[in-house]
Amino acid sequence: MIKSTNIQAIGSGIMHQINNVYSLTPLSLPMELTPSCNEFYLKTWSEWEKNGTPGEQRNIAFNRLKICLQNQEAELNLSELDLKTLPDLPPQITTLEIRKNLLTHLPDLPPMLKVIHAQFNQLESLPALPETLEELNAGDNKIKELPFLPENLTHLRVHNNRLHILPLLPPELKLLVVSGNRLDSIPPFPDKLEGLALANNFIEQLPELPFSMNRAVLMNNNLTTLPESVLRLAQNAFVNVAGNPLSGHTMRTLQQITTGPDYSGPQIFFSMGNSATISAPEHSLADAVTAWFPENKQSDVSQIWHAFEHEEHANTFSAFLDRLSDTVSARNTSGFREQVAAWLEKLSASAELRQQSFAVAADATESCEDRVALTWNNLRKTLLVHQASEGLFDNDTGALLSLGREMFRLEILEDIARDKVRTLHFVDEIEVYLAFQTMLAEKLQLSTAVKEMRFYGVSGVTANDLRTAEAMVRSREENEFTDWFSLWGPWHAVLKRTEADRWAQAEEQKYEMLENEYSQRVADRLKASGLSGDADAEREAGAQVMRETEQQIYRQLTDEVLALRLSENGSNHIA
């Protein structure tokens, strides 16, 4: 029950006194503050506002605090105000939003608080948490240790902090997000836990997973084994253990069980190779690049690439080159080193291409050899698309069409690989994507694909999958390619440069449609589906109408230009 104790304006802070005033049972309701107490809050907050530092938006915070108190509002939002400290908080609030500030600590928390969103601050610790708390998000801070967790807590997000240990987890917890910390162990999981994110820690052993769990993200830890309970999770559950040094015995056991005819457990994602990353290069950027060139060129190449050492993702790109030299293709494919050297020369001459390539390589953080090989495929695609956009094929429509066909085929193979991944229970998705590209490289004339991969045997891609994929690519190419090509960015770049008048006419036609027909066509579509007035449906319908219009206009333009150019070259089709 609520005790009627006088609030005195002395002591360590109002909230400490309020916590003494409100001795609450779960069914208690907060007592309205007296006018004198309100006045004390306002006076305290006014002093706090005056003592702010440059950059803090304490004036906005003061107004929100005042309104919250006067209206007895349950939610207080002080997010994104660059606040470095908080004053005592209104005692009646149940939700506190303080995201994206500069806070290093928090005051005592209101006794009825249920939700705290305090992510993206500089918090080093948290105060005692009220027993009523149900949701805590304090991700992206500097917290080293958590206080006792209330029994009613259901959602805990403390990712990207500096935690070395976790307290006992409360029995009602349904979501635990602790990725990006320094944990090497984890307490037992509550029976009601449904979601777990534990990636990028140092965990060596997992507790048993409760049957209620439907999603467990465990990437990049030090796990060599998994508890047997992982196989007893529901069929629609998802477990990701990529980037862990699972033992050979564990891998074989998982593969044997998950491929059995009676398996009805979760889908488990893994990765071949160990858990090391290539984010830390063995050599400087210049040294990693020059290693691909003959000795008589290395001095000049090194001087050129020294200038790029501080560009974004340069370190990751350097590490990628180190790993690329250790792939099957680098060891076995004739002319591979010369191909890489020629590509690096093109990168040194184009800042835009270099920036794009560095960004693509930044995704290849896993040390798995086939992950590096797939990234090399993507870098080759980036180069060719860049060259097409910059004009290399302006006078060679046949070569541009061939490149377009290859990009189209690769897109379809990615769709097929994505569908295949969904059917597998124990899967390294990188191996699946690479398998379709590598094994069909010759039949589909994929110049950007490596011709060998190391771990095809664990991809789960069968000979029948490959035959079906080839047939699907050819069928879709026959029916869809010209429409796809007419919307392809590099083709548009060619048209703008070489067919400026025709391109301008097409753009004018598109804008006339937008002015005269667009609104009515969207309205008609919404009316036909009974969704008039639905904002989400309107956005979707608008995008569909725009795409259909562009498809019609650009397809007509494409047909005209290709008919002219191909007839000049003695061809009457776009094959």
Curated annotation (Swiss-Prot):
Segments for region (Interaction with target proteins): 1-270
Pfam families: LRR_TTSS, NEL
Repeat (LRR) residue spans along the chain: 69-90, 91-115, 117-130, 131-150, 151-170, 171-195, 197-209, 210-233
Pathway given in the UniProt record: Protein modification; protein ubiquitination
A molecular function (GO) term: toxin activity
Similarity remark: Belongs to the LRR-containing bacterial E3 ligase family.
UniProt-recorded name of the protein: E3 ubiquitin-protein ligase IpaH1.4
The gene coding this protein: ipaH1.4
